[in-house]
Regions:
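PAPS-dependent sulfotransferase catalytic domain
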Residues: 2-218, 228, 245
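Non-catalytic, well-ordered alpha-helical segments in soluble enzyme domains
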Residues: 89, 230-241
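Short, surface-exposed acidic
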Residues: 95, 239-249, 259
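An alpha-helix initiation/capping motif
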Residues: 221, 248-251
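PAPS-dependent sulfotransferase catalytic core
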Residues: 251-265
C-alpha cells in the first residue's frame, strides 16, 4: 500500500473472527514510507488501520480544530470532556444529553471499528466547528494537514505503570481479548505488541515535534495533583479563560464518580 509498509502481523485468537475482539486483537507492525518519518521504528497498529490509512492521512484539517492526543489509558476521556465544555460555553445540559463521542470524536477508534459497528465515519468530516478530536495514533500517522494547518494540540502523558495496568483491564473486560493474565499483557505491551507501541517512542516523539507553535503538554498526575491550576492553564491555551464559578462547576462535573461511565480511554 502506498505510504505504508507492513513488516509483521499478529493473528487474532478470538472465537469469532468477524467480531469486535478480532478487530482489537488482529494487529500489524507498520512503518510509514514518507521520507519525513523514515527513521521512526515500526509501530503495532490494529490491522483494520490499513483500510482507513488513506482516509486518515488525507483527512481535512481546519485551523480551529483541536486535537487531544495521548497513549490509551492516559486520561484523554476526562480531558476531552473538560475541553468540550470549555469550548461550548459550559453547556452541561448538552453534555448530559449527547454522548461524549458525538460531541468530540474518538478519531482512531471509529476509524478501525466502523465497518462492524455501522458507524457513519463520515460524520467526523461533518462535525460542527470548532471540532474536537481525541486520538491515540503515533505522531507519524496523524493526518498530513496537521503539519501545514497547525491546529491546537493538547498532549497528555500518564505514568507507564498506571497506563499498563489500566490497559490490561480495557483489553480483558471491554475488548474481550484472549489474554490469560496480566503478565501476558505486560509481555505484549513491553515487547511492543499492543496498539500504538512502542510506548516510550510514542511519548517522546510528540515531545520532539519541531516548530509547532500550538501544543499544550500536560500530565495526568499533574492534573490530579492541582486540578484548578492545570485546568486554568488548559482553558487559557484554548482561548477560553475560565471564571472561578465556571471552574468550580467544571471540576464538580468532572469528578471521578460522575465520569465513571465515560472513562473508556
Amino acid at each position: 500500500m502506498e505510504g505504508i509498509e507492513v513488516v509483521g502481523e499478529i493473528k487474532s485468537k478470538a472465537v469469532d473472527p468477524k467480531g469486535m475482539a478480532a478487530v482489537f486483537s488482529d494487529r500489524i507492525f507498520v512503518k510509514p514510507t514518507d521520507p519525513k518519518w523514515k527513521e521512526f521504528p515500526a509501530v503495532c497498529m490494529p490491522k483494520a488501520f490499513l483500510g482507513d490509512f488513506e482516509r486518515t492521512k488525507n483527512f481535512k484539517i481546519y485551523e480551529d480544530d483541536v486535537w487531544l492526543i495521548g497513549f490509551p489509558r492516559s486520561g484523554t476521556t476526562l480531558v476531552q470532556e473538560m475541553m468540550w465544555l470549555m469550548m461550548n460555553d459550559y453547556n452541561y445540559e448538552g453534555a448530559k444529553s449527547v454522548d461524549t463521542y458525538n460531541r468530540a470524536q474518538w478519531f482512531d477508534f471509529f476509524n478501525v471499528t466502523h465497518p462492524i459497528q455501522g458507524v457513519d465515519v463520515g460524520y467526523q468530516d461533518r462535525m460542527p466547528r470548532p471540532r474536537i478530536y481525541k486520538c491515540h495514533y503515533p505522531v507519524q500517522f496523524l493526518p498530513d494537514q496537521i503539519w501545514t494547518v497547525k491546529p491546537k494540540i493538547v498532549h497528555i502523558v500518564r505514568d507507564l505503570k498506571d497506563v499498563a495496568i489500566s490497559y490490561y483491564y480495557l483489553r480483558k473486560n471491554q475488548w474481550h481479548e484472549d489474554i490469560e493474565n496480566i503478565e501476558d499483557h505486560f509481555e505484549d505491551m513491553f515487547s511492543a505488541k499492543t496498539w500504538y507501541t512502542p510506548y516510550r517512542e510514542h511519548i517522546e516523539n510528540y515531545k520532539r515535534i519541531p516548530d509547532y507553535p500550538n501544543i499544550f503538554y500536560m500530565t495526568y498526575e499533574g492534573l490530579m495533583a492541582d486540578k484548578p491550576n492545570v485546568t486554568r492553564k488548559l482553558a487559557e491555551f484554548l482561548g477560553k479563560p475560565i471564571s472561578d464559578e465556571n471552574l468550580d462547576q467544571l471540576l464538580d462535573h468532572c469528578k471521578f464518580e460522575k465520569m465513571r461511565g465515560k472513562l473508556t480511554s
